[in-house]
């Protein structure tokens, strides 16, 4: 399972003109399930994401996770958006292949599991809509962007 995470000052996702998710400071996570992924990969990816230290501490070092982004125990927002294109195979030609991505059914199941686990573990979780054409707007903070991956079993 893959997540492209970005540290943001704010982010929003809209579908057909209506806002489905919006956060202030925190992480925007573009999430993709790959063929062979299970709930175990989703849970490991979420655990890594929530503890990944991308926010600055008092000394200015990236040393704090989204769960404690101000160093005083206050959590930042987490905006989770499905994006199957993260699994694209771009090694040949000029058109990406999406064969490595999970099927739409498995992708939805794993995305929904990821979101449910995120909501159980983190106080501020917003989402896009799986399979929808979405507009994602953000104010990148840094920019700070990381590619996280838990390979299929």
Swiss-Prot record:
Its EC number is 3.1.1.96. It catalyses: glycyl-tRNA(Ala) + H2O = tRNA(Ala) + glycine + H(+); a D-aminoacyl-tRNA + H2O = a tRNA + a D-alpha-amino acid + H(+). Its main location: cytoplasm. GO terms for molecular function: D-tyrosyl-tRNA(Tyr) deacylase activity; Gly-tRNA(Ala) deacylase activity; Ser(Gly)-tRNA(Ala) hydrolase activity; tRNA binding. It is an enzyme of class 3 (hydrolase). Homodimer. This is D-aminoacyl-tRNA deacylase. The keyword Cytoplasm applies. The lineage of its organism: Bacteria, Pseudomonadati, Pseudomonadota, Betaproteobacteria, Burkholderiales. An aminoacyl-tRNA editing enzyme that deacylates mischarged D-aminoacyl-tRNAs. Also deacylates mischarged glycyl-tRNA(Ala), protecting cells against glycine mischarging by AlaRS. Acts via tRNA-based rather than protein-based catalysis; rejects L-amino acids rather than detecting D-amino acids in the active site. By recycling D-aminoacyl-tRNA to D-amino acids and free tRNA molecules, this enzyme counteracts the toxicity associated with the formation of D-aminoacyl-tRNA entities in vivo and helps enforce protein L-homochirality. A motif (Gly-cisPro motif, important for rejection of L-amino acids) lies at residues 142-143. Disulfide bonds: none annotated.
């Amino acid at each position: 399972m893959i997540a492209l995470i970005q540290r943001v000052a704010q982010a929003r996702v809209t579908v057909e003109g209506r806002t489905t998710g919006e956060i202030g400071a925190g992480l925007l996570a573009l999430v993709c399930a790959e063929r062979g992924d299970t709930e175990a990969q989703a849970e490991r990816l979420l655990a890594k994401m929530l503890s990944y230290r991308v926010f600055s501490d008092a000394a200015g070092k990236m040393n704090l996770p989204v769960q404690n982004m101000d160093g005083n125990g206050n959590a930042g927002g987490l905006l989770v958006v499905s994006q199957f294109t993260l699994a694209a195979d771009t090694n040949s030609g000029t058109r990406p292949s999406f064969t490595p991505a999970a099927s739409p059914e498995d992708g939805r199941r794993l995305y929904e599991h990821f979101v449910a686990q995120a909501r159980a573990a983190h106080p501020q979780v917003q989402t896009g809509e799986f399979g929808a054409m979405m507009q994602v707007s953000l104010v990148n903070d840094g920019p700070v962007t990381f590619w996280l991956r838990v390979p299929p079993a």
